[in-house]
Amino acid sequence: MTEPETLALLEVKGPETLEKSPPQALVPNGRKLEGEDEVESLGAESSRVGSSAESPTAREGTEDGLDSTVSEAATLPWGTGPQPSAPFPDPPGWRNIEPEPPESEPPTKLEELPEDEASLLPEKAARAFVPIDLQCIERRPQEDLVVCCEASEGEHRRTFLPPRATHPEPPECKWAEAVVKPPGHSCGGCGGCGGREALRAVASVGAALILFPCLLYGAYAFLPFDAPRLPTMSSRLIYTLRCGVFATFPIVLGILVYGLSLLCFAALRPFGEPRREVEIHRQYVAQSVQLFILYFFNLAVLSTYLPQDALKLLPLLTGLFAISRLIYWLTFAVGRSFRGFGYGLTFLPLLSMLLWNFYYMFVVEPERMLTASESRLDYPDHARSASDYRPRSRG
């Protein structure tokens, strides 16, 4: 182009074209952004004034210049179609710049337009306006691929992770929680309830320690029966075993109740979750069997050392065992700390018999500790007392 043509173009566009205008939003034909009507009206008035001041020769020059620019653009080697976007090299220091978070802008009229009106744009104008997103430029496809891979790996790890093994609580904890607390008593977590329970248990055992000799002496003195004459060791052992049959009654009763509880609560699986209503009877039966073995083993040994007048203690100790086990069973099922009373009535006679046997074995008759000789009733000093023995008459 010639110099007069370029000067005419600059005069038409005005000095505003020298400054870099900000990027305009994409607006279809016939639509204008809000706030631009006033600017365009002012520009139109200024252009009218300038055009009126110009000479007609300048107008002709501008028209010729526009035609020449169109002709030159038509002769360029590339067409009017959309050009492929070539990757531009990143300027230095581009990666060190952190992208600012996009501010929430009010929706433009293009977003509010329906699809029918948005399709009114010509194809060439739609190709010319390409929206640019800084976030898309900043994040390359390779980085997107890495992020997607990391997210998929995290999901796969979560799916293949084994579930955490839960440790089941011991049955004792479940029973303690299942016990119904009396109304009006609340525990604040200070540990005072545990101390009270311990004091009650100790007090119940102390009560058994006091009542055990009193009950045994009262039954020995006031019950109207006597033991038969048992001069030999074998006869005494047989008498003790026959008395022990009565002591099995609470154990057999506990086994029956345990079987019924298994049927009633459908707890027939041996390795299933234990139920409180079933475990109470099972523990009672197991503990009673253990105490029965220890109790009557010591009672049989005691029968070989007792004199004839004291053989009445054998059935009395047997009855005390049966009654004490029933008391313990009842208090254990209710869940009270007073069950120590029933346990004490079983354990304290057992401990007394053990100490008596040790006393006779090591102090009174150490020569007969491990021998099977007859009782001292067969000795010459005790023959007269044995012959003079007469059962006591009752009332």
Curated annotation (Swiss-Prot):
Protein origin, superkingdom: Eukaryota
Spans within the Extracellular topological domain: 226-244, 312-313, 365-395
Record's keyword terms, sorted: Golgi apparatus, Lysosome, Membrane, Transmembrane, Transmembrane helix
Entry keyword Phosphoprotein: no
Biological-process GO terms, alphabetical: cornification; cuticle development; epithelial cell maturation; establishment of skin barrier; hair follicle morphogenesis; positive regulation of epidermis development; regulated exocytosis
Region annotated Disordered, chain positions: 1-115
Membrane topology: Multi-pass membrane protein
Cytoplasmic side: 1-204, 266-290, 335-343
Claim: Membrane is one of the keywords in the record: yes
Molecular function terms, GO-annotated: identical protein binding
Full protein name: Transmembrane protein 79
Organism: Bos taurus
